A protein has these predicted regions:
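Membrane-cytosol interface segments of multi-pass membrane proteins
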Residues: 1-196, 317, 323, 327-330, ...
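Alpha-helical transmembrane segments of multi-pass integral membrane proteins
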Residues: 24, 30, 90-94, 192-197, ...
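C-terminal ends of transmembrane alpha-helices
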Residues: 33-38, 99, 197-211, 254-271
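Hydrophobic alpha-helical transmembrane segments of multi-pass membrane proteins
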Residues: 48-56, 160, 164-168, 208-219, ...
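Alpha-helical transmembrane segments in multipass membrane proteins, preferentially the mid-helix core
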Residues: 124-130, 173-179, 222-234, 304-318
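Loop-centered beta-sheet repeat module
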Residues: 193-234
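Alpha-helical transmembrane segments and terminal signal-anchor/GPI-anchor hydrophobic tails
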Residues: 236-322, 327
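Hydrophobic alpha-helical transmembrane segments in multi-pass integral membrane proteins
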Residues: 256-262, 336-348
Length: 397
Protein backbone atom coordinates (compact mmCIF):
# COMPACT_ATOMS: atom_id res chain seq x y z
CA UNK A 1 0.00 0.00 0.00
CA UNK A 2 2.82 2.40 0.90
CA UNK A 3 4.65 1.55 -2.32
CA UNK A 4 1.52 2.26 -4.35
CA UNK A 5 1.06 5.59 -2.59
CA UNK A 6 4.68 6.54 -3.19
CA UNK A 7 4.35 5.50 -6.84
CA UNK A 8 1.28 7.70 -7.33
CA UNK A 9 3.00 10.64 -5.62
CA UNK A 10 6.02 10.22 -7.89
CA UNK A 11 3.87 10.18 -11.02
CA UNK A 12 1.82 13.22 -10.05
CA UNK A 13 4.69 15.34 -8.78
CA UNK A 14 5.55 18.31 -11.01
CA UNK A 15 9.32 18.03 -11.33
CA UNK A 16 9.47 21.16 -13.45
CA UNK A 17 8.14 23.22 -10.55
CA UNK A 18 10.48 21.43 -8.13
CA UNK A 19 13.44 22.21 -10.39
CA UNK A 20 12.41 25.87 -10.57
CA UNK A 21 12.22 26.07 -6.79
CA UNK A 22 15.56 24.29 -6.54
CA UNK A 23 17.29 26.84 -8.76
CA UNK A 24 15.62 29.74 -6.94
CA UNK A 25 16.68 28.52 -3.49
CA UNK A 26 20.27 28.12 -4.72
CA UNK A 27 20.10 31.71 -5.96
CA UNK A 28 18.80 32.80 -2.54
CA UNK A 29 21.82 31.21 -0.86
CA UNK A 30 24.19 32.68 -3.47
CA UNK A 31 22.70 36.14 -3.03
CA UNK A 32 23.17 36.04 0.73
CA UNK A 33 26.73 34.75 0.59
CA UNK A 34 27.71 37.20 -2.16
CA UNK A 35 26.49 40.11 -0.05
CA UNK A 36 29.70 40.05 1.97
CA UNK A 37 31.82 40.14 -1.19
CA UNK A 38 29.69 43.04 -2.37
CA UNK A 39 30.43 44.87 0.87
CA UNK A 40 34.12 44.34 0.08
CA UNK A 41 33.47 46.37 -3.12
CA UNK A 42 33.99 43.54 -5.59
CA UNK A 43 32.60 44.87 -8.90
CA UNK A 44 31.90 41.41 -10.32
CA UNK A 45 30.23 40.28 -7.07
CA UNK A 46 28.05 43.40 -7.14
CA UNK A 47 27.03 42.64 -10.73
CA UNK A 48 26.21 38.98 -10.11
CA UNK A 49 24.36 39.72 -6.87
CA UNK A 50 22.39 42.56 -8.48
CA UNK A 51 21.25 40.20 -11.24
CA UNK A 52 20.22 37.60 -8.66
CA UNK A 53 18.39 40.18 -6.56
CA UNK A 54 16.63 41.53 -9.63
CA UNK A 55 14.41 38.46 -9.78
CA UNK A 56 15.17 35.76 -7.20
CA UNK A 57 12.74 36.85 -4.46
CA UNK A 58 10.00 37.85 -6.94
CA UNK A 59 10.43 34.34 -8.37
CA UNK A 60 10.41 32.67 -4.98
CA UNK A 61 7.29 34.60 -3.98
CA UNK A 62 5.60 33.88 -7.33
CA UNK A 63 6.15 30.15 -6.78
CA UNK A 64 4.90 30.47 -3.19
CA UNK A 65 1.67 31.92 -4.55
CA UNK A 66 1.48 29.35 -7.35
CA UNK A 67 1.69 26.52 -4.81
CA UNK A 68 -0.63 28.15 -2.24
CA UNK A 69 -3.87 27.52 -4.13
CA UNK A 70 -4.95 24.83 -1.69
CA UNK A 71 -4.89 27.26 1.24
CA UNK A 72 -8.48 28.36 0.74
CA UNK A 73 -9.60 24.73 0.83
CA UNK A 74 -7.79 23.92 4.09
CA UNK A 75 -9.90 23.31 7.16
CA UNK A 76 -7.27 24.57 9.58
CA UNK A 77 -6.12 27.83 8.01
CA UNK A 78 -5.01 29.24 11.36
CA UNK A 79 -2.57 26.37 11.77
CA UNK A 80 -0.85 27.29 8.50
CA UNK A 81 -0.50 30.94 9.50
CA UNK A 82 0.73 30.11 12.99
CA UNK A 83 3.35 27.75 11.55
CA UNK A 84 4.76 30.66 9.52
CA UNK A 85 4.69 32.91 12.60
CA UNK A 86 6.40 30.22 14.65
CA UNK A 87 9.11 29.70 12.02
CA UNK A 88 9.61 33.46 11.94
CA UNK A 89 10.20 33.59 15.71
CA UNK A 90 12.57 30.60 15.62
CA UNK A 91 14.45 32.07 12.67
CA UNK A 92 14.78 35.54 14.17
CA UNK A 93 15.88 34.30 17.59
CA UNK A 94 18.24 31.74 16.04
CA UNK A 95 20.09 34.50 14.17
CA UNK A 96 20.27 36.56 17.37
CA UNK A 97 21.71 33.54 19.20
CA UNK A 98 24.48 33.10 16.63
CA UNK A 99 25.41 36.78 16.86
CA UNK A 100 25.32 36.61 20.68
CA UNK A 101 27.78 33.71 20.69
CA UNK A 102 30.31 35.13 18.25
CA UNK A 103 30.25 38.70 19.50
CA UNK A 104 31.68 37.63 22.84
CA UNK A 105 35.13 39.13 23.58
CA UNK A 106 36.61 35.62 23.50
CA UNK A 107 36.13 35.42 19.73
CA UNK A 108 37.70 38.81 19.01
CA UNK A 109 41.07 38.84 17.34
CA UNK A 110 42.67 35.41 16.99
CA UNK A 111 41.36 32.51 14.93
CA UNK A 112 39.26 29.92 16.77
CA UNK A 113 38.89 27.19 14.16
CA UNK A 114 38.44 24.29 16.58
CA UNK A 115 35.93 26.21 18.68
CA UNK A 116 34.02 27.22 15.54
CA UNK A 117 33.78 23.62 14.31
CA UNK A 118 32.62 22.51 17.75
CA UNK A 119 29.96 25.23 17.90
CA UNK A 120 28.69 24.36 14.40
CA UNK A 121 28.43 20.67 15.33
CA UNK A 122 26.66 21.49 18.61
CA UNK A 123 24.33 23.88 16.79
CA UNK A 124 23.32 21.20 14.26
CA UNK A 125 22.92 18.58 16.97
CA UNK A 126 20.90 21.03 19.05
CA UNK A 127 18.47 21.67 16.19
CA UNK A 128 17.99 17.93 15.65
CA UNK A 129 17.55 17.23 19.38
CA UNK A 130 15.12 20.11 19.70
CA UNK A 131 13.05 18.76 16.80
CA UNK A 132 12.85 15.34 18.47
CA UNK A 133 11.76 16.70 21.84
CA UNK A 134 9.38 19.18 20.21
CA UNK A 135 7.63 16.55 18.07
CA UNK A 136 7.44 13.75 20.65
CA UNK A 137 6.45 15.50 23.86
CA UNK A 138 3.42 17.85 23.75
CA UNK A 139 4.28 19.31 27.16
CA UNK A 140 7.76 20.24 25.94
CA UNK A 141 6.29 21.69 22.74
CA UNK A 142 3.87 23.92 24.63
CA UNK A 143 6.51 25.02 27.11
CA UNK A 144 9.05 25.77 24.40
CA UNK A 145 6.55 27.80 22.38
CA UNK A 146 5.64 29.80 25.48
CA UNK A 147 9.31 30.42 26.28
CA UNK A 148 10.17 31.60 22.75
CA UNK A 149 7.12 33.86 22.55
CA UNK A 150 7.83 35.44 25.95
CA UNK A 151 11.49 35.96 25.09
CA UNK A 152 10.58 37.48 21.72
CA UNK A 153 8.17 39.94 23.33
CA UNK A 154 10.42 40.90 26.25
CA UNK A 155 13.92 40.79 24.77
CA UNK A 156 13.59 41.45 21.04
CA UNK A 157 11.63 43.84 18.88
CA UNK A 158 9.38 41.15 17.49
CA UNK A 159 7.51 43.56 15.20
CA UNK A 160 10.69 44.77 13.47
CA UNK A 161 11.33 42.31 10.68
CA UNK A 162 14.67 42.44 8.91
CA UNK A 163 17.03 40.18 7.00
CA UNK A 164 15.92 36.72 5.86
CA UNK A 165 13.05 36.16 8.37
CA UNK A 166 10.97 38.84 6.61
CA UNK A 167 9.82 36.23 4.09
CA UNK A 168 8.00 34.24 6.79
CA UNK A 169 6.13 37.32 7.95
CA UNK A 170 5.28 38.26 4.36
CA UNK A 171 3.75 34.82 3.77
CA UNK A 172 1.37 35.44 6.66
CA UNK A 173 0.22 38.72 5.09
CA UNK A 174 -0.15 37.15 1.64
CA UNK A 175 -2.31 34.27 2.86
CA UNK A 176 -4.50 36.66 4.84
CA UNK A 177 -4.93 38.86 1.76
CA UNK A 178 -5.94 36.01 -0.55
CA UNK A 179 -8.44 34.85 2.05
CA UNK A 180 -9.97 38.32 2.47
CA UNK A 181 -10.17 38.86 -1.30
CA UNK A 182 -11.33 35.35 -2.26
CA UNK A 183 -14.75 36.60 -3.44
CA UNK A 184 -13.36 39.54 -5.43
CA UNK A 185 -12.53 39.52 -9.12
CA UNK A 186 -8.95 38.36 -9.49
CA UNK A 187 -8.00 40.91 -12.15
CA UNK A 188 -9.23 43.74 -9.92
CA UNK A 189 -7.27 42.51 -6.91
CA UNK A 190 -4.09 42.08 -8.96
CA UNK A 191 -4.48 45.51 -10.58
CA UNK A 192 -5.01 47.11 -7.17
CA UNK A 193 -1.89 45.39 -5.82
CA UNK A 194 0.21 46.65 -8.75
CA UNK A 195 -1.08 50.22 -8.33
CA UNK A 196 -0.49 50.22 -4.58
CA UNK A 197 3.02 48.81 -5.02
CA UNK A 198 3.78 51.39 -7.72
CA UNK A 199 2.59 54.41 -5.73
CA UNK A 200 3.45 53.34 -2.16
CA UNK A 201 6.97 54.74 -2.25
CA UNK A 202 5.79 58.32 -2.68
CA UNK A 203 5.51 58.12 1.10
CA UNK A 204 8.47 57.43 3.34
CA UNK A 205 8.85 53.66 3.68
CA UNK A 206 7.28 51.99 6.68
CA UNK A 207 10.64 50.32 7.07
CA UNK A 208 10.95 46.95 8.76
CA UNK A 209 7.74 47.21 10.80
CA UNK A 210 5.95 43.89 10.16
CA UNK A 211 7.81 43.82 6.82
CA UNK A 212 4.97 45.91 5.35
CA UNK A 213 7.16 47.74 2.83
CA UNK A 214 8.55 44.60 1.26
CA UNK A 215 5.21 42.84 1.51
CA UNK A 216 3.52 45.59 -0.51
CA UNK A 217 6.26 45.68 -3.13
CA UNK A 218 6.24 41.92 -3.72
CA UNK A 219 2.48 41.32 -3.34
CA UNK A 220 1.78 41.46 -7.13
CA UNK A 221 4.11 38.50 -7.69
CA UNK A 222 2.40 36.36 -5.05
CA UNK A 223 -1.04 37.17 -6.44
CA UNK A 224 0.10 36.52 -10.01
CA UNK A 225 1.34 33.08 -8.99
CA UNK A 226 -1.77 32.39 -6.91
CA UNK A 227 -4.13 33.29 -9.75
CA UNK A 228 -2.19 31.59 -12.54
CA UNK A 229 -3.57 28.20 -13.52
CA UNK A 230 -1.29 25.28 -14.23
CA UNK A 231 -2.54 25.13 -17.81
CA UNK A 232 -1.68 28.77 -18.47
CA UNK A 233 1.70 28.43 -16.78
CA UNK A 234 2.64 25.40 -18.88
CA UNK A 235 1.36 27.03 -22.06
CA UNK A 236 3.70 29.99 -21.55
CA UNK A 237 6.85 28.09 -20.58
CA UNK A 238 6.38 25.24 -23.06
CA UNK A 239 5.22 27.15 -26.14
CA UNK A 240 8.09 26.78 -28.66
CA UNK A 241 8.11 30.43 -29.73
CA UNK A 242 7.70 31.91 -26.25
CA UNK A 243 10.17 29.45 -24.76
CA UNK A 244 12.84 30.52 -27.23
CA UNK A 245 12.24 34.27 -26.87
CA UNK A 246 12.03 34.21 -23.06
CA UNK A 247 15.21 32.12 -22.81
CA UNK A 248 17.09 34.62 -24.98
CA UNK A 249 15.74 37.48 -22.86
CA UNK A 250 16.95 35.79 -19.67
CA UNK A 251 20.47 35.30 -21.04
CA UNK A 252 20.67 38.87 -22.36
CA UNK A 253 19.36 40.23 -19.06
CA UNK A 254 22.01 38.29 -17.15
CA UNK A 255 24.72 39.89 -19.28
CA UNK A 256 23.35 43.46 -19.23
CA UNK A 257 22.46 43.57 -15.51
CA UNK A 258 25.73 41.97 -14.40
CA UNK A 259 27.79 44.41 -16.47
CA UNK A 260 25.82 47.39 -15.12
CA UNK A 261 25.30 45.97 -11.64
CA UNK A 262 26.83 48.87 -9.73
CA UNK A 263 24.56 51.41 -11.45
CA UNK A 264 21.40 49.29 -11.14
CA UNK A 265 22.01 48.20 -7.54
CA UNK A 266 21.20 51.57 -5.97
CA UNK A 267 17.71 51.64 -7.52
CA UNK A 268 16.57 48.14 -6.54
CA UNK A 269 15.79 49.39 -3.04
CA UNK A 270 13.62 52.16 -4.48
CA UNK A 271 11.54 50.15 -6.93
CA UNK A 272 11.49 46.68 -5.37
CA UNK A 273 12.30 46.36 -1.72
CA UNK A 274 10.48 49.44 -0.49
CA UNK A 275 13.43 50.56 1.62
CA UNK A 276 13.91 53.92 -0.13
CA UNK A 277 11.29 56.53 -1.07
CA UNK A 278 10.83 57.95 -4.56
CA UNK A 279 12.14 61.27 -3.22
CA UNK A 280 15.58 59.73 -3.72
CA UNK A 281 14.96 60.23 -7.45
CA UNK A 282 14.69 64.00 -7.09
CA UNK A 283 18.44 64.37 -7.36
CA UNK A 284 18.08 63.04 -10.92
CA UNK A 285 15.32 65.55 -11.72
CA UNK A 286 11.60 66.12 -11.14
CA UNK A 287 10.71 64.17 -14.28
CA UNK A 288 12.16 60.94 -12.86
CA UNK A 289 10.23 61.50 -9.65
CA UNK A 290 6.89 61.95 -11.41
CA UNK A 291 7.22 58.88 -13.65
CA UNK A 292 8.48 56.65 -10.81
CA UNK A 293 5.26 54.55 -10.63
CA UNK A 294 5.47 53.81 -14.37
CA UNK A 295 9.12 52.87 -13.94
CA UNK A 296 8.16 50.55 -11.07
CA UNK A 297 5.47 48.86 -13.18
CA UNK A 298 7.94 48.49 -16.07
CA UNK A 299 10.41 46.99 -13.58
CA UNK A 300 7.81 44.42 -12.56
CA UNK A 301 7.04 43.57 -16.19
CA UNK A 302 10.71 43.06 -17.06
CA UNK A 303 11.20 40.93 -13.95
CA UNK A 304 8.25 38.72 -14.89
CA UNK A 305 9.70 38.19 -18.37
CA UNK A 306 13.08 37.31 -16.87
CA UNK A 307 11.39 34.89 -14.49
CA UNK A 308 9.54 33.09 -17.25
CA UNK A 309 12.78 32.94 -19.20
CA UNK A 310 14.30 31.11 -16.24
CA UNK A 311 11.23 28.88 -15.95
CA UNK A 312 11.51 28.01 -19.64
CA UNK A 313 15.17 27.05 -19.25
CA UNK A 314 14.59 24.81 -16.22
CA UNK A 315 14.66 21.03 -16.80
CA UNK A 316 11.35 19.16 -16.84
CA UNK A 317 12.52 15.81 -15.52
CA UNK A 318 13.66 14.57 -12.13
CA UNK A 319 17.06 16.07 -11.22
CA UNK A 320 18.96 16.85 -8.03
CA UNK A 321 17.37 20.31 -8.22
CA UNK A 322 13.95 18.73 -7.69
CA UNK A 323 15.01 17.43 -4.29
CA UNK A 324 16.23 20.87 -3.28
CA UNK A 325 12.97 22.33 -4.54
CA UNK A 326 10.97 20.03 -2.27
CA UNK A 327 12.96 21.09 0.79
CA UNK A 328 13.28 24.85 0.36
CA UNK A 329 12.24 25.92 3.88
CA UNK A 330 15.05 23.99 5.55
CA UNK A 331 17.60 25.43 3.13
CA UNK A 332 16.21 28.95 3.50
CA UNK A 333 16.41 28.90 7.29
CA UNK A 334 19.57 26.90 7.95
CA UNK A 335 21.84 28.46 5.34
CA UNK A 336 21.33 31.86 6.97
CA UNK A 337 22.91 30.62 10.20
CA UNK A 338 25.83 29.17 8.29
CA UNK A 339 26.37 32.42 6.45
CA UNK A 340 27.16 33.95 9.84
CA UNK A 341 29.34 30.96 10.78
CA UNK A 342 31.34 31.51 7.59
CA UNK A 343 31.73 35.23 8.28
CA UNK A 344 32.84 34.74 11.88
CA UNK A 345 35.06 31.84 10.85
CA UNK A 346 37.01 33.98 8.37
CA UNK A 347 35.77 32.25 5.20
CA UNK A 348 35.94 35.39 3.09
CA UNK A 349 39.52 35.98 4.14
CA UNK A 350 40.71 32.77 2.48
CA UNK A 351 38.99 33.36 -0.87
CA UNK A 352 41.05 34.12 -3.94
CA UNK A 353 42.24 37.69 -4.43
CA UNK A 354 40.94 37.44 -7.98
CA UNK A 355 37.35 38.72 -7.76
CA UNK A 356 36.10 36.42 -10.53
CA UNK A 357 37.51 33.31 -8.88
CA UNK A 358 36.24 34.51 -5.47
CA UNK A 359 32.69 34.75 -6.85
CA UNK A 360 32.95 31.26 -8.35
CA UNK A 361 34.24 29.90 -5.03
CA UNK A 362 31.33 31.54 -3.20
CA UNK A 363 28.82 30.09 -5.68
CA UNK A 364 30.30 26.60 -5.20
CA UNK A 365 30.03 26.91 -1.41
CA UNK A 366 26.44 28.16 -1.82
CA UNK A 367 25.59 25.11 -3.90
CA UNK A 368 27.17 22.79 -1.33
CA UNK A 369 25.19 24.41 1.49
CA UNK A 370 21.96 24.08 -0.48
CA UNK A 371 22.66 20.40 -1.16
CA UNK A 372 23.60 19.73 2.47
CA UNK A 373 20.48 21.36 3.92
CA UNK A 374 18.24 20.05 1.15
CA UNK A 375 18.56 16.47 2.35
CA UNK A 376 15.56 14.55 3.66
CA UNK A 377 17.15 14.53 7.12
CA UNK A 378 17.01 18.30 7.44
CA UNK A 379 13.65 18.49 5.70
CA UNK A 380 12.13 16.15 8.31
CA UNK A 381 13.87 18.03 11.12
CA UNK A 382 12.50 21.40 10.01
CA UNK A 383 9.03 19.96 9.35
CA UNK A 384 8.89 18.68 12.92
CA UNK A 385 9.95 22.07 14.29
CA UNK A 386 7.48 24.05 12.18
CA UNK A 387 4.33 22.31 13.40
CA UNK A 388 1.97 24.30 15.61
CA UNK A 389 -1.08 22.21 16.47
CA UNK A 390 -4.17 24.38 16.97
CA UNK A 391 -6.79 21.88 15.84
CA UNK A 392 -8.18 21.83 19.38
CA UNK A 393 -9.42 25.37 18.74
CA UNK A 394 -11.76 24.02 16.07
CA UNK A 395 -13.25 21.25 18.17
CA UNK A 396 -16.92 21.60 18.89
CA UNK A 397 -17.82 21.96 22.53
Amino acid sequence: MNQQTASVATKTRDYHVDNIKGILIILVVCGHLLSYLQDMNSTFAIGVRTFIYFFHMPGFIFMSGYLAKGFLKKEYKGEKLLSYAWLYLLFKNGIDLVHFIFRRPYFAGNSHTIELILIVCLFCFGIWLLSQLYSRFPAFQNGFILLVVLYSVLKTNVLTVGAAPWYMMALIWYHIIVYLTKNMKQSHVLAAAVIIAAFANYQDPIGKFLTLSRMINFLPFFLLGFYMTRERFETIVNHPKWKYLLSILFILSAFVITINGRAIKKWIGVFFFGVSPYSKLLKLGDWYYHIAPLTCILWMAVTIMILFGLFALCPRGKTFLAKLGRNTIGIYVLHRFFKDFLIYGGFYGVLSQNEYIAVIETIVVSLLLAIAFGTDFWAKTMNKLSVVNVKWLYKKV
